[in-house]
Amino acid sequence: SRDTLGNIQDMTFEQAWNGERQQKLREDLLSGVRNEFCYQCWDLEDQGSVSMRQAHNISRKHMIPKNCSKIMPFQVPVLELKMSNLCNFRCRTCKPDLSTTWLKDWDKVKHEYESIGVINEIEKQTKFNNDQFIEDIVKLAPTMQIVEFAGGEPLMDPLHYKVLEALEPFGDKISVKYSTNLSKVKFGKFDTIASWSKFKGVDISLSIDGYPALNDYIRTEADTDVLAQNLREVKSALGNKYKGRAALCYSAWNVMGLPESYDYFEHVLDTPVHGNIAWDPIFINPQVLPKELKQLATAKYKKYLNTVEATNERNKRIHRFINQNMNFLNAKDESKHFEQFLRYTKTLDESRSTSFVAVVPEFKDYV
C-alpha cells in the first residue's frame, strides 16, 4: 500500500529494517527528496503547521546516528507495534480493520467507503501471536529506548501483555508509550499498572475526541468518566514515571466543539493537548464543512485563543494545535462531500440510537 514498507508476515523484522522500500525511504530523506510515504507530514508542513516528522527530529535528535546511510545496523531505538484490531469501541473516525467491535453495524455503512474506492478488511487480526514475533522483539530489546503500542486497543490485547512480559527484564532502560482509550487498566489476569511500574517510563496518548458528551458521542461505547478515573489512578500509581497528553482526532464531528474540548482536557483532566487529523475517509475530514460553518468555527477558535495566554508550555500547545487545526480546516474546500458526511452520520445515529444535533446544535439547519 501507499504507506507500507514491509510486512512481517512475509519477512522478519531484520529483513524489513533494510528492505528495498526502507532503503529507498532513507535515501530520499537523506537527500532532501519528499518520499510519498511521508505525505501527511509534507502536507502539514506546507500549511505552516508542525508535523510529527519535525517534532520528532527535535525531541528524538539524540537517537539519530551520526552516520546515516540507506543500509543501517539492526538497532531500533523506537519500535511501534500495532499487533491486532481488537477494540471495545466503535469510534466514528474508525473502521473494522482497526476495531473488531465496528463489525456490529459495518454492513450499514460499508457502501459509503466503497463509493470512494476503499475496501476494508473485516476479520479479527491476531496474526502476530507467534514465537518468532516475540523472539524478534527480544533480539531488539537491548538497543530499544521506546516501545510504542497502538491498535485496536492495546490494553485489551493479550499479545500486548505477552510482549510486556518479554520486555520486563530490560524495563529499566525502556519506556513504553501508548495510544489508548484507557477504558480498562485490568484485563483478565493482567494488571496493567503493575506491569507499567517495571519500566523506565510510561507515556500515554489518550484517545479522546472531546469533552464528555462529545467524546461519548464520537467514540461509541466510551464512558469519559471512567477514562478520567483510570487516568487519576495511573497518575497516582506511577508518579514521575508518567507523562501523557489528550490526543484528539480532529474530524468533522468535533470541529465546533474544539475549544470546549481543550478546556476540559486542561482543567478537568489536567492533561496537555495533542492532536491528530482525520484525513480519510474524505467524507469525515473537517474540510467537508460548508463555508458558513468553517467561518463560525474559525471565529470561535480565535475568540478562545484570546482567553488563553501563551505564557507556559501547555498553553503554547493549545495555541499550536488550535492554529494547526484552523489552518487545516480552511486549507481546502471539500464541501462536495458534506452531504455524504450528513448521510453517514444519520445512518450511524439511527443504528446507535444517538443524535449528532443534540450534541452539536450548530448543525441543526443542515440535517
Please describe what each predicted stretch is:
Residues D46-P77, C87-F89, F128:
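Recognition helices and adjacent regulatory flanks at domain boundaries
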